[in-house]
Amino acid sequence: MHEVKKVVLAYSGGLDTSVILKWLQDTYQCEVVTFTADIGQGEEVEPARKKALALGIKPENIFIDDLREEFVRDFVFPMFRANAVYEGEYLLGTSIARPLIAKRQIEIANMVGAEAVSHGATGKGNDQVRFELGYYALKPEVKVIAPWREWDLLSREKLLAYAETHGIDISKRKSGASPYSMDANLLHISYEGLALENPAAEPEEDMWLWSNSPEAAPDEAEYIELEYSQGDIVAVNGMAMSPAQVLTRLNQLGGKHGIGRLDIVENRYVGMKSRGCYETPGGTIMLKAHRAIESITLDREVAHLKDELMPKYAKLIYTGYWWAPERRMLQAMIDESQKTVNGWVRLKLYKGNVIVVGRESKTDSLFDPAIATFDEDGGAYNHADAAGFIRLNALRMRIAANARQRRG
C-alpha cells in the first residue's frame, strides 16, 4: 500500500472527501494534494482550503480553481449543440461535469509529480466510472485510489465515527438526519436518497432549491430572446454574455418561472435503476431554444441524422466516455452541422413551460415563405410534380402488395 508517494484528491471539503483525505494519509502514508473545482455549485469553495489546512495539507498542495467558464464553454455548450438527452429526459448535468474534473486532476498530478489520483465516488454509482475512464484516457499509467471500494466505512454512521475519532470538523452534520445526497454545478442540481428511494413517493416541496413550483411561479408570462452563433448562445435579450453568464442568467429566469424540474428513474451504467430528482432550469430553456433555431437552419436529412445519433452521443456522456475517440468523432460531425445555426429565438416562459413564439436567421434560414405558403406561390412549387414523387415512393409497397395477392 505504501508505493504511492503523492496523490491528487478531488476534494469538496465535505464529510466524505475529508474522511478520504485523512484515510489516504493513514493508509498510504503518502503526501496528499487537494483539488477543489468551482463549477458553479453555489457554495463557497474557500472553506475547503481551511479544512485541508486543518488536516495537515501544505498550502502549496491546495488547488482551488474557478472552472465555470471552461465548464460551460468546452463541455456544456458542445453537449447542447447535440441536443443530448439521456433516456428521453435527463439533461446530463452530473455526467458532463466529471470529464472536466478528471482533466484538471490529471493536469495537477502532472504538475506536482503525483503518480496517483483519488475520488470520493461510491462503488454503486456511475461517477466512479466517469472519473476513472477520464483518468486513464488522459494518463494511462496513473494509479487510481477509490476508497469506497477499499475501506470498510460503508455507512454514514461509520464515516461520522471515523471523523470524530480523527478530529475532522463535522459541524454541518450534527443538526439531525442526513440531507439528500446532492450534486450541483452551473447546469443543474440533483437530489437522491432518503424518501426518494421510494419511487412512489412525491418529493417534498422544500427539497427543491433552485426553482419555484409552477403553482407559485409568476402569473404573468415573460418573453426572452436568445441570439445564436454557430449553435451557441451569445446574447440574452440583446446583451452579449460569456457562456457561464448565459447559463447563470437562464437559470435565474427558468427558476423564477418554475422551469426545469425532473423526477425520473434512470438506468445506471453499473446495472441498477436509480431514482433521482433534478433541477435544470437554464438547460431546459437552452434545449428548447436550440431545437427551434435548428428547425430553420438545418437541412432535413442533417437534422434527422443528428436525431438518430443523439441517443448514442448522450449515452457516451452518461457512461463516462467523453474522452473516447467515438465521442470526439461524433462531436466533429455535430460541430460541422452547427456552422449555419445562427440567428435568434424568442421564447415565452410561463409556469413551468418554455414556449417558442418566434425564430429567425437572416443569413442561414432554409425556410422559404414563397414555397411554403398556402396561397398562390407564383409557380415556385409545381403541384403536379408530387404525383410522380408519390408513385416512385409507393413502388416498393405496390410490388409487395402484388406479391401478397399472388400468394393468395
Curated annotation (Swiss-Prot):
EC number: 6.3.4.5
Keywords of this entry: Amino-acid biosynthesis, Arginine biosynthesis, ATP-binding, Cytoplasm, Ligase, Nucleotide-binding
Family matches, as SUPFAM superfamilies: Adenine nucleotide alpha hydrolases-like (SSF52402), Argininosuccinate synthetase, C-terminal domain (SSF69864)
Positions that bind ATP: A10, Y11, S12, G13, G14, L15, D16, T17, S18, A37, G120
Pathway listed: Amino-acid biosynthesis; L-arginine biosynthesis; L-arginine from L-ornithine and carbamoyl phosphate: step 2/3
Catalytic reaction equation(s): L-citrulline + L-aspartate + ATP = 2-(N(omega)-L-arginino)succinate + AMP + diphosphate + H(+)
Pfam families given in the database record: Arginosuc_syn_C, Arginosuc_synth
List of residues binding L-aspartate: T122, N126, D127
Entry keyword Cytoplasm: yes
Primary localization: cytoplasm
One of the record's GO cellular component terms: cytoplasm
Domain of life of the native organism: Bacteria
GO biological-process terms attached to the record: argininosuccinate metabolic process; L-arginine biosynthetic process; urea cycle
Family, as annotated: Belongs to the argininosuccinate synthase family. Type 1 subfamily.
Protein name (database record): Argininosuccinate synthase
Gene expressing this chain: argG
